[in-house]
Amino acid sequence: MRKIRTGIYGLNSILDGGFNENSTTVVIGSSGAGKTTCATQFIRRGLLEGQEGIFVSLDENKEQIIREAVEMGWSDILDYLEDGLLVFIDASGREFSNFIRKELPAFVSDWRGANTRIAVDPLTPVLWSTKDQYEQRDLIGFMLKETRRVGTVLCTLEEHGPGELTGPETIIPMYLADCVIHLRYKAAEGNVTRFLKIIKARSSRHSELSHPYRIMKGLGLLVDSAAYKREKTTRIPSQIKDVLDQKSTLPKSIQESVQKALEGLSDEDFKTLKAEHLIENIIAEYSEG
């Protein structure tokens, strides 16, 4: 699966190289966690490579989003807007059902690009527009499907409560998204600590750790990925090889199946695996009867 760079420093290395192309990602966090900054970074990364960008705001107006980007040190956003490479859709204050079912599909149908980055910031007002969960799911699902037709999508979602992803506002977007990223921060005695965690990422190997991150002017979100090191294994560890040698009487087809099954593992995986138990399970899967 083709990967695209996220634009978030340090995130690609813990997300198997980046977002899957034409996928949907939901970034969840409370106010001040850096969600809009994250969305802007994602869009700007594509703009720097000549990709078109669409920023759909469902809450703040265009001027506010641009002002925040310029204050972050990204004044080139103004040039991209003037050149038409970046398109801004201000849907704040609109009737969301009509916007999602009529206006958005019409816009997408007229859009000629096929490798676009789309940011939707935030999804929360859509959920607030109706208390019917079936209607919420239908609206969010339709919106993600339409935007994904022309590119890769990143949405933000406001989180309320203790930050455990248990609120009703998070359930539907988390279910529908291909990738979910959680931003958390704590303020105590004047100090702020922030953590990023990848909750799920379909068809991707990713870190399951909580990674510290910072928000820095000129850079945006900077994720500390040092704790996560994943490299594809270039050799079978000695304990695995010893067990395989003991199984040399197995049919060649099964031996080949076992070897192939091990190819996708990383050096990190072998740290917590018991060699004999692993091999026995793989052999059992490919043995007849």
Identify the function of each model-found stretch:
Residues 258-289:
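Terminal-proximal interaction/regulatory segments of ATP-powered molecular machines
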Residues 71-74, 170-175, 199-200:
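Short, hinge-like loop/turn segments at secondary-structure boundaries
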Residues 1-72:
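The Walker A/P-loop phosphate-binding site
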Residues 1-2, 112-117, 185-255:
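Conserved P-loop NTPase
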